[in-house]
Regions:
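Feature for soluble, non-membrane regions of globular proteins
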Residues: 1-192
């Protein structure tokens, strides 16, 4: 099965001024595409050749895992952003956030602190635990909640290529911009 780069759910310039068109051209058009290309090359002639992306992520290791997980993580990340996003979630997700952190502002502060402090090339996730509660989880490199019992709700990509064009080494400014793009409808659908 040939894997393809999923289409973005918005135009390349739609996240500006928070994330520039140039960043998306590189991050989506080059980095994400390279993971797809590498994955297709690596799975030829293997047990994963006809597997879905999720099956590959859950069952593979080494280079195949790294590339398949990065394809999945990036696709999830793009869907977790939207033009004119931000604000706060409503409904059941908002209630679950309040139950865990006391308020959306307290959650936002905890997520931001976790993301800024997440060392190196990494991801910070809001996840739903098996018991239905929420948590903030940091992963390194290509690691993903898809391989655990946690259900990913939304993520912030903290690999340097996600923000270096726009923010250089100012990760905190990038994380601040993330809050203006967060797609709470996507997160709520994942929570349901």
């Amino acid at each position: 099965m040939e894997h393809t780069l999923p289409a973005l759910p918005y135009a390349l310039d739609a996240l500006a001024p928070h994330i520039s068109k140039e960043t998306l051209e590189y991050h989506y058009g080059k980095h994400h595409q390279t993971y797809v290309t590498n994955l297709n090359n690596l799975i030829k002639g293997t047990e994963f050749e006809n597997s879905t992306l999720e099956e590959i992520v859950k069952k593979s290791s080494a280079g195949i895992f790294n590339n398949s997980a990065q394809v999945w993580n990036h696709t999830f990340y793009w869907n977790g952003l939207k033009p004119n996003g931000g604000g706060a979630p409503t409904g059941a997700l908002a209630a679950a956030i309040d139950a865990k952190w006391g308020s959306f502002d307290a959650f936002k502060e905890a997520f931001t602190k976790s993301a800024i402090g997440n060392f190196g090339s990494s991801w910070t996730w809001l996840v739903k635990k098996a018991d239905g509660s929420l948590d903030i989880v940091n992963t390194s490199n290509a690691a993903t909640p898809l391989t655990t019992a946690d259900k990913a709700l939304i993520t912030c990509d903290l690999w340097e290529h996600a923000y270096y064009i726009d923010y250089r080494n100012a990760r905190a400014k990038y994380v601040e911009a993330f809050w203006s793009l967060a797609n709470w409808d996507f997160a709520a659908a994942n929570f349901a």
